[in-house]
Amino acid sequence: MPSMDIVSEVNEVELRNAVDNSVRELKGRFDFRGKEASIEYKDHVVTLTAEDDFQCRQLVDILRMQMSKRDVDPKSMDVDDKAVHSGKTFSLKVKFKEGIETLVAKKLVKLIKDSKLKVQVSIQGDSVRVTGKKRDDLQQVMALARESELGQPFQFNNFRD
C-alpha cells in the first residue's frame, strides 16, 4: 500500500542563501544608503534591524522576495507584530515554523477525511502519515493539502509504493 508523510520544514541551506541575498540587496538599495540597517541569521531566527519601523517592514519584504526566489515558502515566516525600539534602532525577529502543530494537523486530517478519498490518515508527532490503496489517491491528497489555507506550507516526503 502506498504511503507518504506530510511535513512542514524549512530548507536551512536555501534559507541561509535567501538571507545572504537579502544582505547583498540591502547594501545596494538606494533608500538604505547612509542608514543603519542589517539582516542577521542565527539559530533559525532572522533579526532585522533598521532606523525606523517602516524600514523594518521593508526589510521583511526584501527577505520575503528573496525567499520566494530561493523556493522557500514565505508562509513559514512568523514575524513579530511590533518592532522593538532600543536606542536609535528598531528590530524585528523573524522565526520559522517547523513541524505541523497539533491543531493544524487535526484540521488537515479533517479536511482529508471530509474529501471522501479512500485513504487512512494518522498524526505522528509533527507530521501526518497518509496511506491509501492507489497512488492516485495520495496525489489527490497532495493537491488538497497544497490548496488548503491552513497558514503553513506543506512538503511531502517518505513516499513509498
From Swiss-Prot:
GO molecular function, one term: nucleotide binding
Pfam families: DUF520 (PF04461)
Gene Ontology cellular component annotations, sorted alphabetically: cytosol
KW Repressor (keyword) present: no
InterPro entries with a match to the protein in the record: DUF520, UPF0234-like_C, UPF0234_N, YajQ-like_sf
Family: Belongs to the YajQ family.
PANTHER family: UPF0234 PROTEIN YAJQ
Protein name: Nucleotide-binding protein Spea_3114
Organism: Shewanella pealeana (strain ATCC 700345 / ANG-SQ1)
Origin organism lineage: Bacteria, Pseudomonadati, Pseudomonadota, Gammaproteobacteria, Alteromonadales
